[in-house]
Amino acid sequence: MLKKIFIRSSIGLLVATSLLFGYYFYFKYSFVEDLNYRSSVAETALGSIEYSLTGESDLVLLFIHGTPGGHDQTIEPSSYYRVLTPSRPGYLRTPLSVGKSPTEQAKAYKALLDSLGIKEVMILGFSGGGPAAIEFAAAYPETTLGFIALAAISHSEESWQRDDYEDEAFLNGSDFGLWFNFMLLEFLGDEAFVSFMLPNPINQQKLLKDPKQLENLKKTIWSIWPLSIRREGFINDYLQESNLSLHLTDIKVPTLVIHGTDDILVDISQGEAIARLVPNAKMYVVEGGGHMMMSTHSEEIEEAIENFFQKTVDFIGS
């Protein structure tokens, strides 16, 4: 009797495992196919650069994504601007050979613009995309209408140079393990998801009342997966961010710094340094905003970006 139970249990476990892995591989294949479908690859003077371009406006916002990420980690276009989002070197279909340092990556974005025939952009650097956006704004004032630093990294911190076993474990994690954790979070429901993602209870409740922004946060979370096709860029970012020396004081274009008071991933001091060192920079502080404030404070931030964009373009055109 016990032998039969054991055999049936083993068969059941084998079938369940086969179904789970079968679904996982189908999910991963479909996910990557969709990523590729929603992007293009430009052959530039510096190599292949993957990008997405959405919206209809003549004005372009060049969005430089965070760590880790890709062209799928971006923002929605508005009636005022299109959004161009390259996959940074080492992420998705942009090889790391295109540029490792922030300066090299800035040159790559200029090569992308040249390839696409785009003469001017407003550049926005989000989180780990901040260093390359800073270097771009400093090096190409004739191409840069203005610079927006959104929860952006601006300098190295001593803590980043120490061994961080949690980050190391994440860097070495498997696609399946991360997928399983994400699927489990979704299975547990929205309350469990926002509690895990957002430390601030006020932001948790705000997001639970806004299904659209809750969905946007889920998309942002999935923009770090599969890690295997983003890992090379992720590792490079860690190496670069441990020893940053950026040309902040060389930036001469209009600059807006947007940072949240509750950001525990990129401390507000990073944004304050940009506002202090960039001549005539303006700082917009999002009270209670964490690193995911584009979901929890979306209307406030979108309005700040559009107002800055419009005032800058109107000033240049006057």
Regions inferred by a protein language model and the residue ranges of each:
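Conserved hydrolase catalytic core segment
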Residues: 120-161
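Short alpha-helix in the alpha/beta-hydrolase fold that links the catalytic acid
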Residues: 253, 267-276
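Catalytic active-site module of serine/aspartate enzymes centered on a nucleophile-bearing elbow/loop
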Residues: 281-318
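Acidic catalytic loop of the alpha/beta-hydrolase fold
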Residues: 232, 262-266
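Conserved HGGG/HGGXW glycine-rich cap/lid loop of the alpha/beta-hydrolase fold
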Residues: 50-93
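Short beta-strand/loop motif that positions the catalytic acidic residue
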Residues: 251, 257-259, 263
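Alpha/beta-hydrolase
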Residues: 167-169, 180-246
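Conserved acidic catalytic loop of the alpha/beta-hydrolase fold
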Residues: 104-122
